[in-house]
């Protein structure tokens, strides 16, 4: 997957992984998976989520292309599971002036994954449920979504273009490049929901 234009300002920089055979080492994924990540270009540039270590090089190439020589102001971390957050520390090291946005639990998990010094406290933007971050013409509003499917998960809504960045909330097995509109799209979405999110239904309050 190369850089995709979601809109004139929102770019998809995620990566398809068609070599993986088991998601989380237990769920068969014959058509692979996609690691979703985005860049919002505005007065302040934001990168939304990273990707799994399996896809680091391709993802960094996509990010570099999307940035077009500019530097990001923010990295927004919706979810710390490795398929979303494995490259947080690596990106922070590449862009030392970039701030990292997450909630309090996000940074607890980050320290467990990367160590307390990976993201200096002065670089952390700790958001609360319902708070917003302005990038210029675009604004992200954060909504906590605990147990979809880890305790720290949050989603963000961009109000100008009306785009929801939903973390695992509307996930589906299968790489984007392998998506067939004629196939039963719902079956893989249903299988993902039941196996990844559904087991926590009693704990979900959104």
Tell where the protein language model's regions lie, with residue ranges.
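Conserved beta-strand hairpin/beta-sheet module of binuclear metal-dependent hydrolase folds
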Residues: 3-65, 155-158, 162-166
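Active-site gating loops and adjacent loop-to-helix segments of metal-dependent hydrolytic enzymes
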Residues: 173-196
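Conserved small/polar residues in nucleotide/adenosyl-binding loops
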Residues: 205-206
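Metallo-beta-lactamase
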Residues: 4-8, 101-153, 200
């Amino acid at each position: 997957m190369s850089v995709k234009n979601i809109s004139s300002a929102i770019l998809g920089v995620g990566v398809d992984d068609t070599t993986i055979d088991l998601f989380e080492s237990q769920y068969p994924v014959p058509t692979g998976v996609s690691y979703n990540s985005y860049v919002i270009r505005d007065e302040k540039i934001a990168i939304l989520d990273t990707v799994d270590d399996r896809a680091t090089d391709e993802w960094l190439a996509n990010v570099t292309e999307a940035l077009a020589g500019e530097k990001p102001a923010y990295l927004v971390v919706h979810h710390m599971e490795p398929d979303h957050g494995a490259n947080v520390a690596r990106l922070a090291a590449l862009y030392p002036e970039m701030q990292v946005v997450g909630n309090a639990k996000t940074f607890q998990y980050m320290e467990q994954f990367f160590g307390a010094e990976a993201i200096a406290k002065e670089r952390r933007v700790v958001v609360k449920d319902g708070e917003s971050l302005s990038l210029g013409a675009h604004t992200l509003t954060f909504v906590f979504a605990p147990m979809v499917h880890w305790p720290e998960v949050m989603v963000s809504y961009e109000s100008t273009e009306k785009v929801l960045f939903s973390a695992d909330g509307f996930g589906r097995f299968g790489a984007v490049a392998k998506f067939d509109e004629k196939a039963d799209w719902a079956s893989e979405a249903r299988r993902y929901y039941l196996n990844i999110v559904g087991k926590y239904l009693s704990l979900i309050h959104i």
